Amino acid sequence: MASSMLSNAAVATTAASRSAGAQASMVAPFTGLKSVSAFPVTRKSSNDLSTVPSNGGKVQCMQVWPPLGKKKFETLSYLPPLSEESLLKEVQYLLNNGWVPCLEFEPTHGFVYREHGNTPGYYDGRYWTMWKLPMFGCTDPSQVVAELEEAKKAYPEAFIRIIGFDNVRQVQCVSFIAYKPASYDA
């Protein structure tokens, strides 16, 4: 029993001397940093509201989506209707990403609705009718806009959207409403 106590004490003193040597060679943390109290700092009291931070009054706030009376459709639905120029830019964006443009229309509902239960299910308002075939090989946004105009003439009371489809990953990457019927007032 005495031998076990001796060996434990010897191990403890050897370990202590090793750790002391290791600590001596290490740099102490925060060496050379000065205390905060060394720098004079003037702080305003939390009750002083005489000056408010400002960026010079050049803030232009965007109006948020009104919660009542308007339905949100898809991407870009919170913006005003797209002009032809901005529509061409959006189509060019999806073409630049290598996505295949496709037009779809919905004659009655341009939004997700509840038909088969209390919560919108997978089929409730998510499937639209495809306008012709996807435009594989399309390189010019004006071709897509021409098809959009043709779809508007054929179905003037339908919602029409443009989809960007990635045929490699086989996913829909972008979808936005390109036309809302004149009878839709919200």
UniProtKB/Swiss-Prot annotation:
Main location: plastid
CDD domains, alphabetized: RuBisCO_small
GO molecular function, one term: ribulose-bisphosphate carboxylase activity
GO term, biological process aspect, one: reductive pentose-phosphate cycle
Induction: No expression of this mRNA was seen in leaves.
Protein purpose: RuBisCO catalyzes two reactions: the carboxylation of D-ribulose 1,5-bisphosphate, the primary event in carbon dioxide fixation, as well as the oxidative fragmentation of the pentose substrate. Both reactions occur simultaneously and in competition at the same active site. Although the small subunit is not catalytic it is essential for maximal activity.
Assembly and binders: Heterohexadecamer of 8 large and 8 small subunits.
Identification of the protein by name: Ribulose bisphosphate carboxylase small subunit, chloroplastic 6
